[in-house]
Swiss-Prot record:
GO terms for biological process: calcium ion transport; detection of mechanical stimulus; male mating behavior; mating behavior; neuronal signal transduction; regulation of male mating behavior; response to hermaphrodite contact; vulval location. This is Polycystin-2. The lineage of its organism: Eukaryota, Metazoa, Ecdysozoa, Nematoda, Chromadorea. The chain crosses the membrane at residues 73-93, 325-345, 356-376, 410-430, 448-468, 511-531. The keyword Endoplasmic reticulum applies. The modification Phosphoserine is found at residue 534. The gene is pkd-2. GO terms for molecular function: calcium channel activity; calcium ion binding. Pfam families: PKD_channel, Polycystin_dom. Residues 1-44, 696-716 are annotated as: Disordered. Disulfide bonds join 180-193. The transmembrane domains are sufficient for localization in the cilium. The cytoplasmic tails are necessary for localization in cell bodies and anchoring at the ciliary base. Cytoplasmic tails also regulate sensory function.
């Protein structure tokens, strides 16, 4: 059988259309009417692109406006996917849930535990006496375990599994007694003044004869310490240090008792820092513990616990070789990207940096280079510190440099991962549906910038009001920084209304209601309106554009190709039945309802019969005719809807103009009426004046004869 006459129809099947019972859709017509005349009545099926064509293609735009997939874009997506996998492995290989559990166990032991004789927990210390009790009843028992295990020598071991590295250190920083000035009115009663901590106000004077190291000031260089950041201030690395023995709780208790008896912590003390390090061989993790007591000039104690867990011996484990391989691949990618960016900048000069995604690439490379440098530094620092601790016999273990290098590395690594995932939007935006987010943000950037200024004015006005009005009584408003974040939390529903009300029964509720009204109800809804307006515009604009063929389109075409949907159907063989031919037509893209109607018109009752050549051609013609008829109906209906919408818009415009004309006419009539009234009032005044003058003239004329007669009589 020869089906050559139907080959052209099969090679160029129509696009599937919606069933007639669903009715025409007006959604698309409402947003794409300006370009409806450019659409073809029977557009050809979107051309596909093979894998080999994708590799060999060059960037070009087809005559119908569709952008074809290029070799550069395909290779770029594939290469970046591999880079992202490598980056994620490098970033997360050294992080595990064990790090959290390790920190939590140590926190429960030293921070949350209370003393056997009623000593408060670390966070509950509020006075100097509480600090002494915590040191003797919580810290010492936690570090020195007296119970023994049959299979483990637990000397220097915490929980039988954590080795104590070096001597625990208790460091105290103090200020001089003349670091501030007492007011003259109180100088007779108050002789000493201790200011808040500043490094220039530190008291470095030796206490007593200096026979005990804890009473001799040691510099930061001698202790190998860095600054410690607290809640109130940042404290220097020096201070008066009491080293506890590696083993022996009795000696440690004796040292604490000696310090307490000699009033080692006094009025001038501003910080007590306890630091030590642990190593767990089971999970190959180090835990650096730093517990800070701050003693502000106002009195009391502010506690800050810091427990940081690190993997300092990554390359010495079973997965160390694999980690080195992935890090080497990561460095290779970064080197390739750097050369690529340099060539691009050389071609385009500074204009290259005007594109958003190019700036993202530059930032990503900058963070990546910094990560590589910091990774080398933290590895070198960690290994050197561990070797140093082992060489000195586990007596001295300052880990501040390790903590600093590790934190810097982790922070920059987090930035690299974040920017790398943001860049994924660059590739998924090749499809117009996926590009709506980025296009919406780009279009609304100017409006959001203006909104941000207005929001900042309102926000910081409320923040300053809260700080000034409630700062002395509510912790959330104790400073401007806390006040700003308290207001941000209020937007999310996290607030303490009772505290505001108890602080000020008038301004508290008024402040809360005003902030919720202006910020939550007005400003946030304005922000959503800006985003929504931009999204509607972007969606309408993208609906008017013709579909391009990007990475996602190429992938979906391959998936459709696997199911043979949208492909040219093979001509039915001699043994093909009506059921087979129906399936071929359906796979070619025709609507199932049109196929069934065509089969019904040709009185096809048995689907197992063979398809004659003539009947096959007639059925194909009928299905194509019905599909084309429906498409024309849809196009005409869409044109009618667009025309109807435009007429409605014109009507609204005309009615608006008429309303404005009527308003102007009413205004003119009012003005004319006022002018006439003013003119009538003026005429009445003129008439009244004229009548008054006439009356006066008549009265004068009437008086004259009388006066004349009187004068004549006098003369006589």
């Amino acid at each position: 059988m020869n089906y050559g006459a139907a080959d052209e129809r099969w090679a160029n099947p129509p696009q599937p259309v919606a069933a007639a019972e669903h009715g025409p859709s007006f959604d698309h017509s409402m947003v794409s009417e300006e370009y409806e005349h450019d659409k073809k009545k029977n557009p050809a099926q979107k051309e596909g692109i093979s894998f080999s064509q994708a590799l060999l293609a060059s960037g070009h735009e087809k005559s119908d406006g569709k952008i074809k997939l290029t070799a550069r874009s395909f290779m770029e997506v594939g290469g970046y996917a591999v880079f992202l996998i490598v980056l994620v492995y490098v970033a997360f290989a050294q992080n595990s849930i064990q790090s959290y559990y390790y920190s939590k166990v140590m926190s429960d032991l030293f921070v949350a535990s209370t003393g056997a004789s009623g000593a408060p927990a670390f966070g509950s210390c509020t006075s100097m006496d509480n600090i002494w009790d915590w040191l003797s009843q919580v810290l010492i028992p936690g570090i020195y375990w007296t119970e023994t295990s049959n299979s483990t020598d637990n000397e220097n071991m915490i929980y039988y599994e954590n080795r104590l590295l070096g001597e625990p250190r208790i460091r105290m920083l103090k200020v001089t007694n003349d670091s501030c000035t007492v007011m003259k009115s109180f100088q007779r009663e108050i002789k000493e003044c201790f200011a808040n901590y500043e490094e220039k106000l530190e008291d470095k004077t030796m206490v007593g004869d200096g026979s005990v190291d804890a009473f001799i000031y040691a510099t930061a260089k001698e202790l190998e310490n860095l600054k410690t950041v607290g809640t109130i201030a940042s404290y220097g690395g020096g201070g008066f240090v009491q080293r506890l023995p590696v083993a022996g709780s009795t000696e440690a208790q004796s040292a604490i008792a000696t310090l307490k008896a000699n009033r080692w912590i006094d009025r001038g003390s501003r910080a007590i820092i306890v630091d030590f390090a642990l190593y767990n061989a089971n999970i190959n993790l180090f835990c650096v513990v730093k517990l800070l007591f701050e003693l502000p000039a106002s009195g009391g104690v502010i506690t800050t616990p810091k427990l940081m867990t690190y993997d300092l011996l990554t390359y010495q484990t079973s997965g160390g070789t694999r980690m080195m391989i992935f890090e080497g691949i990561f460095c290779g990618f970064i080197l390739y990207f750097i050369f690529e960016e340099l060539f691009a900048i050389g071609r385009h000069r500074l204009h290259y940096l005007t594109q958003f995604w190019n700036l993202v690439d530059v930032v990503l490379l900058g963070f990546s280079v910094a990560t590589i440098i910091l990774s080398v530094n933290r590895t070198k620092t960690g290994v050197n510190r561990v070797n140093s601790v082992i060489e000195n016999g586990l007596t001295n273990a300052p880990f501040d440099d390790v903590t600093s290098s590790e934190n810097s590395y982790l922070n920059i690594k987090a930035c690299v991962v974040f920017v790398a995932w943001v860049k994924v939007f660059k590739f998924i935006s090749v499809n117009k549906t996926m590009s709506q987010l980025s296009s919406t943000l780009t279009r609304s950037a100017k409006d959001i910038g203006g909104f941000a200024v207005m929001f900042a004015v309102f926000f910081f006005a409320f923040a300053q009001f809260g700080y000034l009005c409630f700062g002395t009584q509510i912790a959330d408003y104790s400073n401007l920084y806390n006040s700003a974040f308290a207001l941000l939390r209020l937007i999310l529903g996290d607030f303490n209304f009772s505290a505001l009300e108890s602080c000020n029964r008038f301004f508290g509720p008024a402040f809360f209601i005003a902030y919720v009204f202006f910020v939550s109800f007005i400003l946030l809804n304005m922000f959503l309106a800006i985003i929504n307006d931009s999204y509607v515009e972007v969606k309408a604009e993208l609906a008017r554009k013709k579909d391009g063929e990007g990475i996602l389109d190429w992938f979906m075409n391959k998936v459709r190709g696997l199911t043979k949907r949208g492909k040219r159907p093979d001509a039915p063989g001699e043994d093909a039945t009506y059921e087979d031919y129906k399936l071929m037509l359906y796979r070619a893209g025709y609507a199932e309802k049109d196929i069934n109607e065509a089969f019904t018109r040709f009185n096809v009752t048995s689907m197992t019969e063979h398809v004659p050549e003539k009947v096959a051609e007639d059925i194909a013609d009928e299905v194509a005719r019905m599909t084309e008829q429906k498409r024309n109906y849809m196009e005409n209906h869409r044109d009618y809807a667009n025309l109807n919408r435009r007429v409605d818009q014109m009507q609204e415009s005309v009615f608006s103009i008429v309303d404005r004309i009527e308003g102007v006419n009413a205004t003119l009539q009012t003005i004319e009426k006022q002018r006439v009234q003013q003119q009538d009032g003026g005429n009445l005044m003129d008439l009244s004046a004229l009548l008054t003058n006439q009356v006066r003239n008549r009265e004068s004329a009437a008086r004259r004869p009388t006066i004349t007669s009187i004068a004549d009589k006098k003369e006589e």
